[in-house]
């Protein structure tokens, strides 16, 4: 804690802030390891770019729809629960990819929708928790350090994954990478179990301009 307090100018760095950084770091590394290579893995199975287009269309369609649902749940239930739902969906996605293996191309829309739902729940909750857990004095530190983690993961992940896939024959490299990502998701699951967010104050509106008057 003392090291982080020096970085923030002797401001108090609480446990939840560090846990949120860990969760974000694990997420960034997992995404950087897998994002490009999931598409390549699916393309190698079908050889048709239209299938990849359908897969990614399912991802980007479900993500904003999930944002709306996640916003309602975050207000009415709990932001931590929404975060857990997101992490759980991402875990199920990678476990499913590992289980179906060479038959993954048969479930493109299901996999894409599952990933989009995971992204939607995760990012809504993460952004809300970032605002709630950090204080004005520690927010710059959080955003800066999170940027370092994200950038580092973005540089290391694709290189490491590419090396592993090219070093192992056949689909073994992809299986190894996806298994590593599944383990990173497990680490996120473990970290978020210890996360405690303060009770929300005020109201969360997905479309503030449509707020009714009292």
Curated annotation (Swiss-Prot):
It comes from the Bacteria. The keyword NAD does not apply. PANTHER family: INTEGRAL MEMBRANE TRANSPORT PROTEIN-RELATED, MAJOR FACILITATOR SUPERFAMILY (MFS) PROFILE DOMAIN-CONTAINING PROTEIN. GO terms for molecular function: transmembrane transporter activity. The lineage of its organism: Bacteria, Bacillati, Bacillota, Bacilli, Bacillales. This is Uncharacterized protein in sodM 3'region. GO terms for cellular component: plasma membrane. It is found in: Cell membrane. The keyword Transmembrane helix applies. It comes from Geobacillus stearothermophilus. It is a multi-pass membrane protein. Disulfide bonds: none annotated. Keywords: Cell membrane, Membrane, Transmembrane, Transmembrane helix. The chain crosses the membrane at residues 18-38, 51-71, 80-100, 108-128, 145-165.
């Amino acid at each position: 804690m003392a090291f982080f307090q020096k970085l923030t100018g002797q401001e108090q760095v609480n446990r939840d802030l560090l846990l949120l950084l860990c969760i974000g770091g694990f997420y960034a590394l997992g995404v950087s390891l897998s994002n490009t290579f999931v598409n390549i893995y699916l393309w190698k199975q079908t050889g048709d770019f239209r299938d990849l287009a359908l897969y990614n269309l399912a991802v980007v369609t479900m993500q904003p729809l999930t944002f709306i649902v996640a916003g309602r749940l975050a207000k009415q239930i709990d932001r931590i629960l929404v975060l857990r739902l997101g992490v759980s969906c991402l875990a199920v996605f990678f476990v499913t990819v590992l289980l179906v293996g060479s038959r993954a191309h048969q479930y493109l829309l299901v996999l894409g929708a599952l990933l989009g739902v995971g992204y939607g729940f995760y990012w809504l909750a993460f952004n809300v928790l970032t605002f709630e857990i950090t204080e004005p004095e520690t927010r710059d530190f959080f955003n800066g350090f999170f940027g370092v983690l994200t950038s580092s993961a973005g540089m290391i992940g694709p290189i490491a994954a590419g090396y592993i896939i090219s070093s192992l024959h056949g689909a073994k490299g992809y299986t190894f990478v996806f298994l590593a990502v599944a383990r990173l998701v497990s680490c996120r699951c473990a970290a978020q179990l210890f996360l405690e967010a303060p009770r929300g104050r005020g109201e969360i509106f997905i479309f503030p301009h449509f707020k009714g008057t009292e």
